[in-house]
């Protein structure tokens, strides 16, 4: 009996191994993922859903910026090491948080890689013209991801120094060699590559989407071009593309701030309304894993490093402006909590995506209106101002104030100059909105 038993036991691994070899061959005969077996323009469109970065830099950049102060209280603490390292401008070695530099880098280059897979497939087919809309979207996604990376990992663009500042590696084809190095090039070269993709994509991109506010449409491409050319210091082009977004009457397409301000600030009511896809003011929406929707509002989470009362009342939301007291004149209600020093507007929803109900495990998600008409209008105003067209800049500011203030305030250039001319520059002991 022992002999027979040993015989069958010995044979069992051989049988399993044989089955494994058959299964392995079947597995290896299949493509590892659907991106490698694209056959139709519809399948390319499905792939391009993943060509939008699954990350947004708001949390990181707010911690880096002068919108955040250290709040001194014995019961207020940092949310995690990432928040503390970011605020203190330390080298960030945390990688788990979705908004760390590491994860931002990975998410945006993953989006670029996905776009490159789509572009490579389109370039390989005989009926490439049938894929024009998909090619346009892929090029815009690649340009957008690289532009977003440039705002975090590169020096601010200056046409006088861009030839000397480092850019970023700009992959234009699928990676086939592990560890292949791509030269970073200069910031000028990076912007040239972004512009090339942007302009080609703009010509090709379509409008037929099941959920257009989550994809690049013509309008979203124009809004992207406005911001890109503003950053690139080509102000005439920024104005040109903003005109295409805003039309002859910008106030017709701006957000209805009165309606939004009537909503209750508790829960996700205001934030959900702000990013509603049916709102014509929203041009491109980006839902991503993010904790910023809850850390930025008046909760105890991350309350040591926050946009607090002092900032709000002297520099930002409730500070004086040429239109008067911002906290009273603007069509928004500043949300705050007496238990912490956090002052905020409710514009970013926070929704946990549950992965395991029994274990209570989930991923926090937020949604960002990365392009909207109000922002595009103010970008055009900035382009006008930086090119010396001050009267036109004031007209755009007044268009925004007409929908953003309770009294539909209108300003003159002299009033703006007088207000900021008499305002002292910021000092740590006497903070103001005016900074060098």
Write out the residue ranges for each language-model feature.
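Aromatic-residue-lined binding/catalytic grooves and analogous aromatic/hydrophobic interfacial grooves
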Residues: 25, 219-253
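Conserved, well-structured interaction surfaces
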Residues: 82-154, 185-188, 200-206, 361-368, ...
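Hydrophobic-face positions in mid-chain alpha helices that act as interaction patches
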Residues: 239-374, 398, 404-436
């Amino acid at each position: 009996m022992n002999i027979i038993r040993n015989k069958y036991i010995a044979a069992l691994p051989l049988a399993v191994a044989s089955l494994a070899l058959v299964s392995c061959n079947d597995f290896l005969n299949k493509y590892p993922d659907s991106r490698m077996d694209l056959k139709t323009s519809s399948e390319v469109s499905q792939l391009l859903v993943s060509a939008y970065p699954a990350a947004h830099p708001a949390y990181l950049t707010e911690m880096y910026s002068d919108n955040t102060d250290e709040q001194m209280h014995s019961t207020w603490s940092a949310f995690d090491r990432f928040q503390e390292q970011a605020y203190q401008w330390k080298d960030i070695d945390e990688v788990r948080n979705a908004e760390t530099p590491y994860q931002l880098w990975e998410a945006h280059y993953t989006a670029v890689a996905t776009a490159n897979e789509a572009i490579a497939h389109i370039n390989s087919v005989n009926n490439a013209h049938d894929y024009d809309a998909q090619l346009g979207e892929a090029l815009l996604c690649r340009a957008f991801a690289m532009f977003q990376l440039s705002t975090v990992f590169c020096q601010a663009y200056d046409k006088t120094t861009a030839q000397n500042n480092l850019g970023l590696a700009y992959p234009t084809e699928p990676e086939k060699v592990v560890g292949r190095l791509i030269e970073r090039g200069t910031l000028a070269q990076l912007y040239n590559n972004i512009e090339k993709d942007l302009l080609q994509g703009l010509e090709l991109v379509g409008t037929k989407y099941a959920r257009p506010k989550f994809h690049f449409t013509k309008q979203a491409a124009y809004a992207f071009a406005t911001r890109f050319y503003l950053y690139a210091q080509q102000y005439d082009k920024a104005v040109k593309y903003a005109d295409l977004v805003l039309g002859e009457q910008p106030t017709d397409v701006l957000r209805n701030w009165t309606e939004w301000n009537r909503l209750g600030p508790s829960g996700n009511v205001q934030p959900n309304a702000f990013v509603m896809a049916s709102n014509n003011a929203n041009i491109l929406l980006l839902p991503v894993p993010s904790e910023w929707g809850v850390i930025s509002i008046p909760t105890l989470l991350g309350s040591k490093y926050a946009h607090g009362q002092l900032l709000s009342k002297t520099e930002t939301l409730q500070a004086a402006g040429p239109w008067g007291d911002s906290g009273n004149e603007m069509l928004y209600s500043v949300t705050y909590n007496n238990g912490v020093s956090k002052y905020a507007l409710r514009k970013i929803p926070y929704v946990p995506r549950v992965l395991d109900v029994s274990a209570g495990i989930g991923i926090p998600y937020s949604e960002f209106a990365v392009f909207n008409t109000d922002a595009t209008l103010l970008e055009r105003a900035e382009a006008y101002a930086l090119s010396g067209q001050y009267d036109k800049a004031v007209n755009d500011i007044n268009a925004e104030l007409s929908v953003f203030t309770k009294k539909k305030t209108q300003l003159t250039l002299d009033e703006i100059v007088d207000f900021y001319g008499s305002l002292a520059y910021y000092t740590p002991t006497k903070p103001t909105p005016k900074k060098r």
